[in-house]
């Protein structure tokens, strides 16, 4: 079907393997759609702004974009609230009925999210690992696994899941910096503070808008009781992490913890009032 105006012509082809910029297969043949999806994916990895409205707008125009529905489900499933399970299931059902042939990677992501919805968190971790074993540059699967590990307090996998994938990555691959940001947090949660800080700072230099990487470095500094360094870390980079409706609010809270330790209560109240 050929759409007019700004709507892109596309087909779902079973005989051609379509790839994203990291070489991960996508079942949708429509470059403009996939480019817009990549923008939402980067938003997800940065933890700065909520990517769901952007992908919902995309899905209004292209309701047969199965990966977009899976992405929406992953975003919602990255939290632990049970009340959102019906919304997650709705997105998964939309992906399955989108009209095209899902690939193995997409079916694997659906299986992982479904296990999470059923309360089988360990099974969900395993399902994500199976996707990553086949597609080690799938950052949507990596994000999902990272959040599962975080919610379960699984420090070993927070670090190890990413270490298993690093041989497949280098700095030329899109979203490499976000992999480093996740790795930094896993290292910090494993008490490997010096390595975590170095990796987290590198991630922030590669993508200054990576709020999760800022958060990882902030955790290191807090764990080491370096309160003045924490104030400098967040204060000197405020333009990079402080905006948005995602993790920036949590990073403000971390900054206030440092300020509380040095008894700068006036600044804390200024932040609260703003």
What are these regions (language model features)?
Residues 19-34, 95-106, 171, 175:
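TPR-adjacent "capping" and linker segments in tetratricopeptide-repeat scaffold/adaptor proteins
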Residues 32, 63-68, 104, 137-141, ...:
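Residue-level recognition of tetratricopeptide repeat
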Residues 34, 39-56, 60-64, 69-106, ...:
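Inter-helical turn/loop elements of alpha-helical hairpins
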Residues 36, 69, 76, 108, ...:
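TPR repeat positional signature
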Residues 54-57, 85-99, 122-132, 155-169, ...:
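Alpha-helical repeat scaffolds
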Residues 161-262:
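Internal metal/ion-chelating core segments
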